């Protein structure tokens, strides 16, 4: 399983792209098999322009980098309260583009005035991907003490010390020149007097490492060389007219000089990397710059303001200087207006500046903690947690691969029809709708649903008679006759069950209008239990915000014996494994360990012993109270030696009353989604729906059924 590292910026202008590139290079140096994932595009120019980091990675490496979701699409989903849909799209995009990677580097959103939702969305994405969080921040005007306070404040907004996925922090632009607002202000221009020069607050990286509340995984000092931009980038920013191209694509601008004085007072600024800004009616400055160029000084560029046409005689005089590669370009604005435009120049790395990108990567990588990078590919002891969007995505993918047929006896029920259409569209399963074709098509049309490929409609009136003989044969020991069989086959659940029994379909889903008893009774009579199973039980998949839990049994067995409870535990653990959840089974009771007595506790204790004996490969412990099973701090005091306490993923309730009450209380109080009940122990998969099931509930139950069918047939 890939390690997922998410870089989350704490503010604007922290240099997120530079840090991402540096971490990528640090991983490349260690031979890490890496993939880069930007969930949501955030182009600086706004709109749906290409994302900066993703474009740079694609243009400058062979690393796989997924196409991010467009910001306009994300904003549309958020404005229509569809954050769950957004998270599912992100997890789908993640899985589609990060296969075979040892480490996936995820880049979060930068919080801006326009995107004030960035941090809350970053937190949701981190939870969805179960990512290890690394904050990226710049020093700004902070002293070491203030910086540590800001680190602690940032951690608290992401769950604080309880969030064990917070791995550390990377401090960028350490000891950079900043203004009073903490914005980086490199002194490119000589136009300002000393009173406006930026300040530098010195911090020792070694001392910062010692005092930081989080591990400092990188402390990157400010480097002026990294912002040296190409002359062509300046020309593009100003929308300038190029007079002489020269080396405009490779010359670097390291300072800006406004030539308002006489030549003798400006000669010291005629140096390599200078952008000389002068009015186009100052031929003396132009000629002086040309002389410097002919003497080997690689001036960054010459910028002419005012829009004056260059005298042809001057151009002729400067030909040899132009031939040295001196870039010259012109704007129509005056010098003052031009200076204002230059101050708004974006110092970010352009996507096509390969040389600068390489320099940034090498420089930043030198300051990323090498031990941390090495640890990313070491054997991880982090237990796997499956987030709800990841779980739902996994259901869809596994069902697609299974390619199964699922019969829906309530074929003309509106929610069922809609769910069948969704399953067909997503390729989850081929749904067989039982019902009158005209009525089913009418229901579909009334909902704007198109029933195309991937959906079959079977008219019970046409096929019912063909199943009479088989039903009589299966139930002849119970006195079944043909007239009674015909009467029972009027029930579409019975008809669908016989289709399943004869392998015409792979699974059955019902319950949107039928009771649980009506759904389960025919399969129990005709399909019966799987080999090795003495009972049928059920589980609910509880989709908590950060993790998926398995609850059993909350729907079938009123008061199981110790032996039955042990079997339910084993069935539930196997179901967890089948759906990608690492099973740590808590046998629940009202007391923990040996602290309680009584028949109820003894039943759970005996069930735990039996389950452990039957399946020593599974992690099973009990009796445990619910809080001891889920809360690490409670587990330390109540069950310090338990391998399950504080980290359980599968919860086995002692009876139906406790299980059903707890399931509904957790579901309602936490306002979370649950999927189920999924029946366990059947020879072939049959699943029951709640009569209040939503369309999505039906879709995921169909997916569960298809996956069960695939696993049972292996």
Curated annotation (Swiss-Prot):
UniProt key word Acyltransferase: yes
Domain of life: Bacteria
Record bears the keyword Transferase: yes
UniProt xrefs under NCBIfam families: PRK05632.1 (NF004167), PRK09653.1 (NF007233), pta (TIGR00651)
Gene name of the record: pta
GO molecular function: phosphate acetyltransferase activity
GO biological process, one term: acetyl-CoA biosynthetic process
UniProt domain comment: The N-terminal region seems to be important for proper quaternary structure. The C-terminal region contains the substrate-binding site.
Cleaved signal peptide residues: none
Swiss-Prot/TrEMBL catalytic activity: acetyl-CoA + phosphate = acetyl phosphate + CoA; propanoyl-CoA + phosphate = propanoyl phosphate + CoA
Protein name: Phosphate acetyltransferase
Database matches in Gene3D superfamilies: 3.40.50.10950, HprK N-terminal domain-like (3.40.1390.20), Isocitrate/Isopropylmalate dehydrogenase-like (3.40.50.10750), P-loop containing nucleotide triphosphate hydrolases (3.40.50.300)
Function: Involved in acetate metabolism. Catalyzes the reversible interconversion of acetyl-CoA and acetyl phosphate. The direction of the overall reaction changes depending on growth conditions. Required for acetate recapture but not for acetate excretion when this organism is grown on ethanolamine (EA); is unable to complement an eutD deletion during growth on EA. Works with proprionate kinase PduW to capture exogenous propionate and regenerate propionyl-CoA during degradation of propionate and 1,2-propanediol (1,2-PD).
């Amino acid at each position: 399983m890939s390690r997922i590292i998410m870089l989350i910026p704490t503010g604007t202008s922290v240099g997120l792209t530079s840090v991402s590139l540096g971490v990528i290079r640090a991983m490349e140096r260690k031979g890490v098999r890496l993939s880069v994932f930007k969930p949501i595009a955030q182009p600086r120019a706004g709109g749906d322009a290409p994302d900066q980091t993703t474009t740079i990675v694609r243009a400058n490496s062979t690393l796989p980098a997924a196409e991010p979701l467009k910001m306009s699409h994300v904003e549309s989903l958020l404005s229509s309260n569809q954050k769950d849909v957004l998270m599912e799209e992100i997890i789908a995009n993640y899985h589609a583009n990060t296969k075979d990677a040892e480490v996936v580097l995820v880049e979060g959103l930068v919080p801006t005035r326009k995107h004030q939702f960035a941090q809350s969305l970053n937190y949701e994405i981190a939870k969805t991907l179960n990512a290890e969080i690394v904050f990226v921040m710049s020093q700004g005007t902070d002293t070491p003490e203030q910086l540590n306070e800001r680190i602690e404040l940032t951690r608290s907004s992401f769950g604080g010390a309880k969030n064990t996925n917070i791995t550390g922090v990377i401090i960028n632009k350490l000891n950079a020149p900043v203004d009073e607002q903490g914005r980086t202000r490199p002194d490119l221009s000589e136009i300002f007097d000393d009173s406006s020069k930026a300040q530098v607050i010195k911090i020792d990286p070694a001392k910062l490492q010692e005092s930081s509340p989080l591990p400092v995984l990188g402390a990157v000092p400010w480097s002026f060389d990294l912002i040296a931009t190409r002359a062509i980038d300046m020309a593009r920013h100003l929308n300038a007219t190029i007079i002489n191209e020269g080396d405009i694509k490779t010359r670097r601008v390291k300072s800006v000089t406004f030539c308002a004085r006489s030549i003798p007072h400006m000669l010291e600024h005629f140096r390599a990397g200078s952008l000389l800004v002068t009015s186009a009616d100052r031929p003396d400055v132009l000629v002086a710059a040309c002389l410097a160029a002919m003497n080997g000084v690689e001036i960054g560029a010459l910028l002419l303001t005012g829009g004056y046409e260059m005298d042809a005689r001057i151009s002729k005089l400067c030909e040899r200087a132009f031939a040295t590669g001196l870039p010259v370009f012109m704007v129509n604005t005056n010098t003052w207006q031009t200076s204002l435009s230059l101050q708004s120049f974006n110092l970010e790395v352009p996507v096509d500046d390969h040389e600068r990108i390489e320099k940034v990567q090498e420089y930043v990588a030198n300051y990323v903690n090498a031990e941390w990078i090495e640890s990313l590919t070491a054997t991880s002891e982090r237990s796997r947690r499956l987030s709800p969007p990841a779980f739902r995505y996994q259901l869809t993918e596994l069902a697609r691969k299974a390619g199964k047929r699922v019969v829906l006896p309530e074929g003309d029920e509106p929610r069922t029809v809609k769910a069948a259409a969704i399953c067909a569209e997503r390729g989850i399963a081929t749904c067989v709708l039982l019902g009158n074709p005209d009525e089913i098509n009418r229901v579909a049309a009334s909902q704007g649903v198109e029933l195309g490929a991937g959906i079959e409609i079977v008219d019970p009136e046409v096929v019912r008679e063909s199943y009479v003989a088989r039903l009589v044969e299966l139930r002849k020991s119970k006195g079944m006759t043909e007239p009674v069989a015909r009467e029972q086959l009027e029930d579409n659940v019975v008809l669908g069950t016989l289709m399943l029994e004869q392998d015409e379909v792979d699974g059955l889903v019902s319950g949107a209008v039928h009771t649980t008893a009506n759904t389960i009774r025919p399969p129990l009579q005709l399909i019966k239990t799987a080999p090795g199973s003495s009972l049928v039980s059920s589980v609910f998949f509880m989709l908590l915000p950060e993790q998926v839990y398995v609850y059993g049994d909350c729907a079938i067995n009123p008061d199981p014996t110790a032996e039955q409870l042990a079997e339910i535990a084993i069935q539930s653990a196997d179901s967890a494994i089948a759906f990608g959840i690492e099973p740590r089974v808590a046998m629940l009771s009202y007391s923990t360990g040996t602290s309680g007595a009584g028949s109820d506790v003894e039943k759970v204790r005996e069930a735990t012993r039996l389950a452990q004996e039957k399946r020593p490969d599974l992690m099973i412990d009990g009796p445990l109270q619910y809080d001891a099973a889920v809360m690490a701090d409670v587990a330390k005091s109540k069950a310090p030696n338990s391998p399950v306490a504080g980290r359980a993923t599968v919860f086995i309730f002692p009876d139906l009353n406790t299980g059903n009450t707890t399931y509904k209380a957790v579901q309602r109080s936490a306002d979370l989604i649950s999927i189920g009940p999924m029946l366990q122990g059947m020879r072939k998969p049959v699943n029951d729906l709640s009569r209040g099931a939503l369309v999505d509930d039906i879709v995921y139950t169909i997916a569960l059924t298809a996956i069960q069918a695939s696993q049972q047939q292996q």
